[in-house]
Amino acid sequence: MASTIKKLTSKYSLKSRYSNFGSCLRKVHIDGFRGINNLDLTLDFPVTAVSGLNGAGKSTLGQLAICGYKKPSTSNDYKRLYIVDFFPISVADPKPITDDAKTIYFYETDDYKKAQEVTISRAHSAWSGYKRQPERHCYYVGFTVYIPKIERRDLSVYGRASLEFTEKREIGKDVVKKMARIIGHKYDDVTFQGISHKKKESEIGIASRLGYSYSENNMGFGEGRILYTIDKLETCPEQSLFILEEPETSLHESAQYEFAKYLLDVCNRRHHQIILSTHSSVILNALPPEARKLITRDVNGVEIHHKISACHVRSILSSGHIRDLDICVEDVFAKILLTEAIRAKNKNILKAIAIHAIGDKDAVREAVKVLRKTGKKAIAVRDADVGQDITNHLLSFPGSRPPEVEVFGNITVAASIKEKYGIDISWILERDDVNDHHKIAEHIASEAETEEEVIRTFAIERYLEKITTEFDELIKNIEIYL
């Protein structure tokens, strides 16, 4: 999956984006919809996963995004969606949108420096601006798009006694394998069978496995919805836009993870743009930080936080014990280093703090911002090469380089590792061409034939034994917050 993410990141770079994804959305500016005002949704990755509490506005973002394209001129059976389809005004909801509401769509063009900008705004009771939108097939996979046939009682159910089979649509073997990998069952075959009853026509999915076959009428909701969704993603035109509402519904955790992998794969192959709302920590953790958005709503309005998910915040808020101070760091290495440095200097404060590995510098900054808005006392300790910003409660590790480089670059640490494991750190990093400091411990552990956490802990202990006052200022600043 890492290689797929790397390929997608390269394809989606600003200079290469249009050639791969066409006139996809770069940004959507939302103003005046369901309490969302002056908000920018930036789409920094082909797959964007929006998390947040119920009622925060996740669905609103997707609904407005899918209204960003007009019907392709070559499509006959395709129907586009408009803002009015999602924001009905009635006695029950007289003002879901403001009188001056508008949405500004920013599309990629062949000149990456100049995005196409189209504003959709209210002109009296109607909406103007749709005609200037680019063309694209868009698909909204909400909860009512796929309802099990046994529940909606379509003609495959009420006309079952006199059904006639019409044309059968075959599904490619590779697509069947992808569905099987997600669900966790091996399928012998999956097809869509055309059916007819009293001049009415429809289509029903039929799966074969373990020596017998069954139709959608006997499928569970999760299995049927996956079949429907994958079929759409694989058979629609390339470079389509998909909005998926909580795709994890009725899927077990392994299926959620495999589905997230599949979304990355299909975007890499078919260059779709996908925006999904989700509460699934499995899906969110399977996607890169650039794909994650957290939306929050309070008395001051609605905000979007980048590279962080609701799961990060939820895990802190529901950790099962109350600490006086939450400290956000970038990764596990930073968490262990800070924990052990505090233990060596003032171990008593460990009982008053909780340290959380969040993500990169942007995710850490956003996490602190969100936590402080919830009333939690929170700070960050960022890598030394990023620096500190005391005003925004962002402290920094000592030194001038990332913690991994400071630790493994220490002469005493290098000598200790060579003595115990017979490894020359400089040579290993040169031989393996390690440019990412997050990979240093992994490569050393591989050469030493041991686990990464063993090397990590050993190096940090040797490092802290050698240094003297380097962490004093940082720990003093942490104590100020207690």
Protein language model regions, located:
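The start of beta-strands in P-loop NTPase/AAA+ ATPase cores
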Residues: H137, S240-L241, L325, A378
